[in-house]
Amino acid sequence: MPTLLMLEGFKFFFYANEHEPKHIHVMKGGDFTKIELQSLAVTHNYMKPKDLKRALEIVKYNQAEFERKWDEYFN
């Protein structure tokens, strides 16, 4: 499970056996969400609204880097 970033209590990662579309998993405490990288669509969410909002901001800011790391790992 490659961890891409740890920030503000959030852990941004993907699993070694992922599939398209490119997406990232985010955990904070016991809460988690899954965000598609290209569209920033939330496909699963079990986070508090303020944490989800912050997670989306962080993913948007790091979007290009997360996509690059996805491509490096899976290609």
Regions picked out by a protein language model, each given a short descriptive name:
Residues L7-F13:
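Charge-dense, helix-prone N-terminal extensions
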Residues M1-L4:
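Local beta-strand/beta-hairpin segments that build beta-sheet-rich folds
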Residues Y15-M47:
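A short, structured beta-strand/loop element
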Residues M47-N75:
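C-terminal structural segments of small proteins and small subunits
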